[in-house]
Amino acid sequence: MTRVALVKTRERITGVNRALDLLDLPSFGGKTLFLKPNYNSADPPPGSTHNDVLVALVRRLRELGVGPITVGDRSGMGDTRQVMQRKGIFHLAEELDFETIVFDELEAEGWQRMHVPGSHWRKGFAVAQPVLDAGAVVQTCCLKTHRLGGHFTLSLKNSVGLVAKQVPGDGYDYMSELHTSPHQRSMIAEVNVAYQP
């Protein structure tokens, strides 16, 4: 059974900690952790993950016994490195001792092609290998609708940032396929079978 915690507060750090208390997560036992924020753009929340949320998660997950933490993303609306720079993520990485990955900068071997039976993706889709290699994955979704598709998808759409726009050496544009498909909502959901949160 999946547990869900809802916390209403104006204090993000308090809210993150309270939600994690309610979830009563077991110790991570030193597992590596991939933390997927929403840095589709550097827009203020709810357009992107608030830095207080990221800081609270990193600190609290360390208390719960996670090993090395990596934070990474692929922006859909701009240059990912510039988005993360504008958000101050590289500074936070130094301050809080976590690694960062800009998915746009991964070489071809940094992507794993996924073929989901019955999927609407014509050629499958490519997921960032560091996500698949992590012992645990945590996402920080933004509660917003989406310009392309216009539906409220929570963390399902956030997983699209784990998928390559293009894999180096392969000219196929996965995001063009997704954003022009009449099956866009199904394709977004299908991306989420690639990993276990």
What is each PLM-predicted segment?
Residues 1-197:
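N-terminal and secondary-structure boundary signal
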